[in-house]
Amino acid sequence: MKFKSIISTITLLCLLFLASCVYNKKTSLEAFKQDVYTPEYATGFKILGAKNAQSTLIQVSNPWQGAKNVTMSYFISRNGELPPTGFTGPTIPAGAQHIVCMSSSYIAMLDALGQVDRIVAVSGINYIANPYILAHRDSIKDMGPEINYELLLGLKPDVVLLYGIGDAQTAVTDKLKELAIPYMYVGEYLEESPLGKAEWLVALSELTDSRDKGIDVFREIPKRYQALKDLTASVEQRPTVMFNTP
């Protein structure tokens, strides 16, 4: 009986060791070619996966005005999986709990997902109307128009959500890399359609490990959009609307 117990223990340890080896095995970058989520309206991102991998890649295309043939990839790590061989972009832990939003648009997306409470800092808090942010402005930090890196380090964020403004943003991302702070460009403002802009909430839901919820939330938006569009189809006098003005 004792001999059988020893054999069973050794077998169990071997299985655990093998599982650990597979668990931490690196997947090649070329293996991430399976479509996990292909947007219907947005053109600036897609989510890719690989066989036998829980982690995913978010690919962001041309994330600022004037960008051409620019593709950035972000590794969304799950279950301790390592970035694929040859990957040099940011690694972001799935289920991000501490998020810095450098645009109010990202706040609205996280709010739609029911995850606005994960925001630890914003840019320009005095110009944000979100009820949760206003109610917690004593604890949510303000990065200001330019990132306060000392403050940012103290927050230990899981990810900083950025908008791209061309070469001027390079200094920011270089500094974030130096500080080992994960970041992701969100290019929703470059989408031509309102639905394309809204669909970026699915990309954010991948960061918070709630992709299914993100897809469900977004699926309802085109229905409401079409209903409002139909409602105004017969309006003859159409006013000019100006927004994002001082």
Regions found by a protein language model. Name each.
Residues 1-10:
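Bacterial N-terminal signal peptides that target proteins for export
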Residues 21-105, 213-241:
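Bacterial Sec-exported substrate-binding components of ABC uptake systems
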Residues 56-154, 159-166:
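A short, structured surface patch at a secondary-structure boundary
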Residues 9-19:
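Bacterial N-terminal signal peptides
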Residues 51, 62, 123-126, 187, ...:
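Residues at the C-termini of beta-strands that transition into short coil/loop
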Residues 92, 148, 158-161, 165-246:
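Extracytoplasmic substrate-binding proteins
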Residues 6-7, 99, 152, 204:
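N-terminal, helix-rich and Lys/Arg-enriched segments in bacterial and organellar proteins
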